[in-house]
From Swiss-Prot:
Entry keywords, A to Z: Amino-acid biosynthesis, Arginine biosynthesis, Cytoplasm, NADP, Oxidoreductase
Primary gene name: argC
Protein location: Cytoplasm
Name of this chain's protein: N-acetyl-gamma-glutamyl-phosphate reductase
Pathway: Amino-acid biosynthesis; L-arginine biosynthesis; N(2)-acetyl-L-ornithine from L-glutamate: step 3/4
GO MF, any single term: NADP+ binding
InterPro entries with a match to the protein in the record: AGPR_AS (IPR023013), AGPR_type-1 (IPR000706), NAD(P)-bd_dom_sf (IPR036291), NAGSA_dehydrogenase (IPR050085), Semialdehyde_DH_NAD-bd (IPR000534)
GO aspect biological process, one term: L-arginine biosynthetic process
Function: Catalyzes the NADPH-dependent reduction of N-acetyl-5-glutamyl phosphate to yield N-acetyl-L-glutamate 5-semialdehyde.
Amino acid sequence: MIDIGIVGGSGYTGGELLRLLSVHPSANVVCVTSRKLAGKPVTSVHQHLRGLLDLRFEAPSPAEIAQRCDVVFTAVPHGTAMDWVPELLDNGAKVIDLSADYRLPVDVFEKTYGIKHRAPRDAVFGLPELHPEVAGASLVGNPGCYPTGATLAIAPLAKAGMVDRVVFDSKSGISGAGAEPTETSHYPNLAENIRCYRVTNHRHVPEIKQELSRLQNDIRISFTPHVIPAVRGILTTAHVFVKDSFQDTIQDREFISKLYSDFYRNAKFVRLVEGVPMLGNVRCSNFCDIGFEIEKNSDRIVVISAIDNLVKGASGQAIQNMNLMMGLDETAGLWFPGGAP
C-alpha cells in the first residue's frame, strides 16, 4: 500500500482526492491537514465520506508528513504550496501539487500570479497524455482545469502543425470557483444565468500556450471562460482556424478522425465521440470526451471537449499522475464511468 498525505484537505479538491482515494486499491490515506480544522473529523466537512474514512484533520510540519507518507498531494491556494514542497521532497516524499506553483517557469508564474516564487524546483507538468516523463518524476505540477480540457481538445491538430489561430470558449460548473462563495459563484447571481469572467488575459492562458507551443510554436491563442449554473464540468469549444495550406485537409472527416485516434491511441482516459460531447457523460469521472464538427468550405473546425473539473481537471488527474509515478496501472482507482444522467 502507498501511504498518502493531503495538505489542504478541507476544500473541494481535497475532498475529491479523499473520495477517489477511499476506494483506490493501493492507497492508504494516513494524514489530512487543515490548520483551521485541526482535531476535527474529516467527515465533519466531507460528510459524503462517512463510513469510509476515520481520520481527523491535523496540522503537522512538512517534515513530519513526509516521514509518514510516500506521496503527498498539496491542495492549497496558489503561493502556499511553495512553502511545503521543498521540505516534503527533501524528506523523501513524492509530491503532486494541485496549485499553480509548479506548473510554469518561475518568471511566467510571477508575472501571471503576481507572487514572488520563494522555492523554485524542477517539476513535470502533469498532463500524462502529453508528458510520459511523469512516470519518473518526484514533483508534478498538476495542470489547471481549463488548460486540461483546452489542450487535449486540439493537441492532435497542433502536433500536425495545422493551427493558425484558436479561440477557446469554456463553460465551467460553479465548483471551479472553490468552496468559498464569490460574486461570480454565489448562487443568486448565477441561477438561470451565465457569467463571463476574466474575459481576456485569464491566468490559465500561459499554461495553454506553454503546452500547445511544445507541439506547434506559432499558434495564436484566445481564451474566455464562463461560469454556468451547474456544479461540475467544463465544456470547451475550440474554434480552430487552420493555416491556408490545410483548408482542404480539414474537409476530410476521415483524415481528422484518424489524426485524433492515432494521437490518443494509448490515452486511456481520452474518448473520441461522434457528435458533441456531453458533460453528463463525464461527470464524476476521469474521462475527457472529445468530438468535432467541420465547417464546410471554410478554414474552421470546431472541437469540443468535456471533462469533470474536479476529477480530470484536478484531483482525478492528480491520482492518475500518482499512479504513473508509483509504477501502478494508470487507471488504478479511476476506471469507472461518469454519473449520467
